[in-house]
Design a protein with these regions (language model features):
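Positively charged, small/polar-rich N-terminal and surface patches that mediate targeting and assembly
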Residues: 1-103
Length: 103
């Protein structure tokens, strides 16, 4: 089976910034993404868990998308415009997809 090169971009950001981020991604031409809850973690500020959050807007989410390599810079520019002033981590991973026309 033939596979095609792609980039998997994972953006972990404060839940309150989720709609701003997804809007920026859509404006950058990203047509698909998945939003996952983040239940806890550890970073420069220490450990944290989502279980103690009182409001729905608190905590973190991870937005994951796969795109063609030539679209990466445009996506990263859009994501960084949202993430740079907030808590967030952006990772980029090389991956292979089976149906390139979907990305």
């Amino acid at each position: 089976m033939q596979t095609h090169d792609a980039k998997r971009v994972e953006i972990t950001i404060e839940r309150a910034m989720q709609s701003r981020l997804t809007q920026a991604l859509q404006e950058a031409g990203v047509t698909g993404y998945t939003i996952l809850p983040v239940y806890g973690g550890s970073g420069r500020s220490g450990e944290w868990e989502r279980s103690g959050d009182v409001t729905r807007g608190a905590g973190m989410v991870q937005v994951v998308c796969m795109i063609k390599p030539e679209r990466l810079d445009h996506l990263l520019d859009a994501a960084f415009a949202v993430v740079e002033k907030h808590i967030g981590v952006v990772t980029v991973v090389d991956c292979q997809v089976l149906r390139a026309e979907r990305f």
